From Swiss-Prot:
Disruption phenotype: No visible phenotype during normal growth or under oxidative stress caused by diamide. InterPro entries: HAD-like_sf, HAD-SF_hydro_IIB, HAD_sf. Its cofactor is Mg(2+). GO terms for molecular function: 5-amino-6-(5-phosphoribitylamino)uracil phosphatase activity; magnesium ion binding; phosphatase activity. This is 5-amino-6-(5-phospho-D-ribitylamino)uracil phosphatase YcsE. Its EC number is 3.1.3.104.
Length: 249
C-alpha cells in the first residue's frame, strides 16, 4: 500500500451496503454505527452508496441519521438528507425488453427495479408503463452467466457490474457509483480526491478507483481488492469501522 494517512484529506466517506456496511444478517453493527457517528461529529460527510433502491434501503439509511446525500440503484438516483430526489437517470425500455428476452431465453432468476417497485418472479405486461432503474440476473451456473454476459456486452449502451459473484447488474451506460459521487462532491465543494470509498463488488470498483482512497473489504471479490489502496477486515468483523478509525478518526 503506497497511500499513507498523511497523504489524504478525507472529507467524505462513501460506503456500500450489502457485503460492506451490513453484516451477513443484513444489520449494521454497533461498532460501524459508532464510527460513522464519530466521523460525522468530526465534520466528515458519510454517504451510503448502494445498488439497492430507496424503498429497500431507506429504513437502514434513516437509522444512521446522516447529514448528506444518499446514492441508490448503483448511481441511478441521488437523494438529499431528507430523501428528496436530486437526480435520476433511467434505463431505456428497449434495453429492458432485450434483457427480459435474454432472461427468458436462458430461464434465469432475475430482479428489476423501477422507481416504485422491485420486480421478482412476476414482470409487467407493458414495460413502457414503468420507469426503469436497473435490471439484474442471478445465475449460479458459470457457463450460462458467461453466455449472458457475452450477449449483454454486445450492447455498448449498458453499464454492466455485479453485487455478488453470481449475479449481473445492468444500468444505463455511464451510471455508476463514482459518477454519482462526483456530482455529490461537486455540490459539497470538493473533489473525489477527498473521498474514501468502501465496497466489496464490481459495482463498487469505479468509486474505489476514482476516490482519493479506495478501500476493499476483506470479503471483497479479488478484482476489487486488486483495485483498492487498502484492504480492511470483512463485513462481519466491523471492517467499515476499522477503516474509518484507521484513516479518519
Amino acid at each position: 500500500m503506497s497511500v499513507q494517512r498523511e497523504d489524504v484529506d478525507i472529507k467524505l466517506i462513501a460506503i456500500d451496503m450489502d457485503g460492506t456496511l451490513l453484516n451477513d444478517e443484513q444489520l449494521i453493527s454497533d461498532e460501524n454505527r459508532k464510527a460513522i457517528r464519530e466521523a460525522e461529529d468530526k465534520g466528515v460527510y458519510v454517504v451510503i452508496s448502494t445498488g439497492r433502491t430507496l424503498m429497500t434501503c431507506r429504513e437502514l439509511a434513516e437509522s444512521l441519521k446522516l447529514s448528506s446525500f444518499l446514492i441508490t440503484a448503483n448511481g441511478s438516483e441521488i437523494w438529499d438528507s431528507n430523501f428528496n430526489l436530486v437526480e435520476r437517470k433511467l434505463l431505456h425500455t428497449d434495453h429492458i425488453q432485450m434483457m427480459w428476452d435474454l432472461r427468458n431465453k436462458h430461464n434465469t432468476n432475475f430482479w428489476a427495479s423501477t422507481v416504485n417497485k422491485v420486480w421478482r418472479g412476476e414482470f409487467p405486461e407493458n414495460i413502457t408503463d414503468h420507469e426503469w432503474l436497473k435490471f439484474g440476473f442471478d445465475i449460479e451456473d458459470d457457463d450460462i452467466r458467461n453466455e449472458v454476459l457475452e450477449e449483454l456486452r454486445k450492447n455498448k449502451e449498458l453499464e454492466i457490474t455485479n453485487s455478488s459473484p453470481t449475479n449481473i447488474e445492468v444500468n444505463a451506460l455511464g451510471i455508476n457509483k463514482a459518477a454519482a459521487l462526483a456530482k455529490v462532491t461537486e455540490k459539497l465543494g470538493f473533489t473525489m480526491e477527498n473521498v474514501m470509498a468502501m465496497g466489496d463488488s464490481l459495482n463498487d470498483i469505479a468509486m474505489i478507483k476514482e476516490a482519493g482512497l479506495g478501500v476493499a473489504m476483506g470479503n471483497a471479490q479479488d478484482i476489487v481488492k486488486e483495485t483498492a489502496d487498502y484492504i480492511t477486515d470483512t463485513n462481519i468483523e466491523d471492517g467499515v469501522a476499522k477503516a474509518i478509525r484507521h484513516w479518519v478518526l
